[in-house]
Amino acid sequence: MFEISDIFIEEKSVLKEGKELLITDTDKPVISFQLQSDRRETSLRSACIRVNNWIAEVKEQIGIKYEGEPLKPFTRYDVEIEAVDDRGNNSTKCAEFMTGRKRLPWSGKWITDEMHVTEKPNSPRPLYFRRKIHLEKAVEESWIVVTAVGIFD
C-alpha cells in the first residue's frame, strides 16, 4: 500500500474529514503532502502537482511554492497530486482550497443591534446579529467567514 494521506496548503490540512474549506490570501501558497506506505523505507521518486493550469514536477514533498498564474480573489482552486514511490507504485489525491478577499477594497454594511453592548462576564443572553436581504436571482453558492477580536483566542 502506497498512498497520499494528506495534502497541506500553507501548512494546513485540506483532506482531514470534517475540515472546513481552507481559505488563503497568499499569492503563492506553499503546497506539501504526506505519504503513507506499508513498506519500510519507502521513498518518493517523483510527484506531479496540478493547480488549475499550473503543473509542477517535483521530487520533494514539502514546501513546493505555487508559481502559476496569479490567484483570483474569492475563487475555488482544485489541487491534484500524483506521487510515485521508488518501486513505481503511484497514488493520486485531489483537494481544493479557496482564496479570500486578497487586496480588494472592503465595502459593506455592519450587521448590528440597536443596543449598546457592555461586556458582562458569563452573560446568559447571546447576541444575535441579523439582516434580511431580498435577492433578485437564485443563490448558486454562499459562504460566510466570521471573526472578531478575542472570540477565538
Regions found by a protein language model. Give the residues of each.
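Low-complexity, Pro/Ser/Thr- and charge-rich linker/hinge segments at domain boundaries
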Residues: 98-124
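Surface-exposed, short loops/turns at beta-strand junctions within beta-sandwich domains
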Residues: 68-76
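Short, compositionally biased P/S/T/A/G/V-rich stretches that sit at domain boundaries
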Residues: 1-24
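Aromatic-lined ligand-binding clefts that engage carbohydrates, nucleic acids, or primary amines
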Residues: 136-153
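Solvent-exposed loop/turn segments flanking beta-strands in beta-repeat/beta-sandwich domains
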Residues: 25, 36-51
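Structural beta-strand segments of beta-rich domains
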Residues: 27-31, 140-142
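Extracellular fibronectin type III
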Residues: 86-101
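Conserved structural position at the C-terminal beta-strand
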Residues: 81-83
